[in-house]
Amino acid sequence: MTNKSENIKDEKEQYPLLSMINTPADLRKLPVEKLPEVCDELRQCIISHLSSNPGHFASSMGAVEITVALHYVFDTPSDRLVWDVGHQAYPHKLLTGRREAFASQRTFGGISGFPNPAESEYDSFVAGHAGNSISAALGMAIADSLTPGREERKTVALIGDASISNGIAFEGLNNTSNNPNNLLIVLNDNDMSIDTNVGSLHRYLSNLTTSAGYNRWRQRLYQFFRSKWLINDSGKGRMLRFNNSLKALISGSQNIFEGLDIRYFGPFDGHDVVKLVKILSEIKDMKGPRLLHIRTVKGKGFPEAEKSPTVWHAPGKFNPLTGERISESSASDVEKWQDVFGKHLSALADKDDRVVGITAAMITGTSMTHLFKTHPERAFNVGISEGHAVTFAGGLAASGKRPFAAIYSSFLQRAYDNIIHDVAIQGLPVTFCIDRAGLVGEDGVTHHGFFDLAYLRPIPGLNIAVPSDAETLRQLMSWSLTQNSPLAIRYPRGSAPEKIIPSLSAGGEVDDSVRPEARRLRGSEENNSRVAVLAVGPIVKEALTAAENVAKDGIEVDVFDMLWVKPLDTELLREIASTHKCLITLEDGMIAGGFGSAVEEFLHDENIECEVIRLGVPDKWIAHGSVPQLRALCGYDSSAIEKVIRKVMKDL
């Protein structure tokens, strides 16, 4: 009890205003002059927590003032805020009853790092992927307009200048004026994606200015006509279109948003909270779709983050006083999977001028930085537009190039039709390098990459490989250049062992024309083992650990690195099934429709009788936590595999 009292006292001393805010209603009791102090305390709170419990730092630091202003002006949670992506939502969480739980964010059993309606009534819609906020908020706003008694309810979509370049964001913008609604879009323009922002829209926004005097003139003109009964709200749209045309005539250009009949305000300083409150109060009750354009600095309030916003997007642990980042990496020289990919892609480009690389706003995350340095003319960052990335790759392949499209597994879902229609049907030689496959850990449910095997397997002509080590990844990338069909290579987040078992290395110079194959990692044909574990990817290491543990009790288990999910190594499968009583399949992905399902389907179709136990992600949503914690939760860490082996052996 004493400790709790002391903690409360310390919090009040450290955050005198923030400690009194348990809900936005408490925030709204403060005089507007106090809001800059609230913003300062929010930043200090974010710095204090994220320095020891890492998360999305720079985005949240840049969105403090707009978050405070929105909760101050709007009656949340009755009025709804819809966050795009959610990287910037930490100030929102701190203001909406989750301050005491904030230390647990992104940890197993703690609060999520992203907005989620299951967590709080203040989180109106799931966020994690980019571009959905406008469409979701528009649906809410139109639903309110159709519901008696809710016509005056307010809905706000908060979207960044990188996210708004999404196809779905444009689709949402294009539909905002089709039906009556009171949607407000706040465009948070910080000149950044996770990496540097790209594209024509980004350049357009950088040059966009609108006279505040013009906006005042237009509102006064409308009020004048309305007072004289010359126009009413139903005719306002026609007047706005006339005003837009007049503005275009005067300025020589048309604002893209006003061209879509969206009332535009801005750009304004996104770090002047008092002014933001004034502007939001003025436009809050205006009818029809509106867009407020604010300019912010990613990482605002922390000098190191302002200088290097890409590095400080999710910087890991750091010293809150000096800004020095604290490395938790060991002395091991083991490379990360994305670095193996990035370096080998650059090496392939050195030898083959057909090689090109594509990333969707993840230059650093996918390690495409290497290709951008060595062959910038053949490296393409298309922004947050995975569908375009895939079809663009298809166009390159159709014209003789060999594109490697490096896209996170969770985000590749957004391009499913493009994979089928624009690559697979034509059999184009696009190599999909699927990063962050499997359980990704602390980013949780919106970012896990465990669906790819299940959604790619049904596509005719698309081969799928899951390397267990760096050597095999490089072999697959090199081999793909000798093929004339699409290939998907998936690999997880984290360190890539050079060789899963050194003695089984290919050794010497690898023949790029030779297709890498499945291999036995443990056991032999002579040991008469009755159980075999068939794994794909580096998760096979868990199987090897389990096999070593049961071997101490005289239980022998064979372990195979199967590598190929499609096509299956059917000859090897027949051999294994004929010499074992039970096959345990293991994958870092969904059980339903994945590698294990492929094995079961093959055995069934071939009328081969052999028990199959499938291990992987079960049919449920998996929250956030460390990867080891989540593997244990899903039942496919080494301990869980060991239990399955012991039970099978007991029952045989």
Task: List the predicted regions and their residue ranges.
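Generic long, charged, amphipathic alpha-helical segments
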Residues: 381, 547-548, 553-576
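N-terminal amphipathic, basic-rich helices that act as targeting or association modules
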Residues: 3-95, 256-262, 269-277, 290-293
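Glycine-/acidic-rich phosphate or pyrophosphate-binding loops and their flanking alpha/beta elements
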Residues: 251, 278-281, 313-314, 336-351, ...
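Non-catalytic terminal/interface segments that mediate subunit docking, oligomerization
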Residues: 80, 297-412, 418-428, 485, ...
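Long, well-ordered, tryptophan-enriched scaffold segments
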Residues: 4-12, 191-341
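Cofactor-binding active-site loop characterized by glycine-rich and histidine/acidic residues
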Residues: 56-179, 337, 355, 360, ...
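Peripheral docking tails and interdomain loops at the edges
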Residues: 318-320, 325-333, 441-443, 463, ...
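Structural signature of the thiamine diphosphate
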Residues: 236-304, 429-434, 452-501, 513, ...
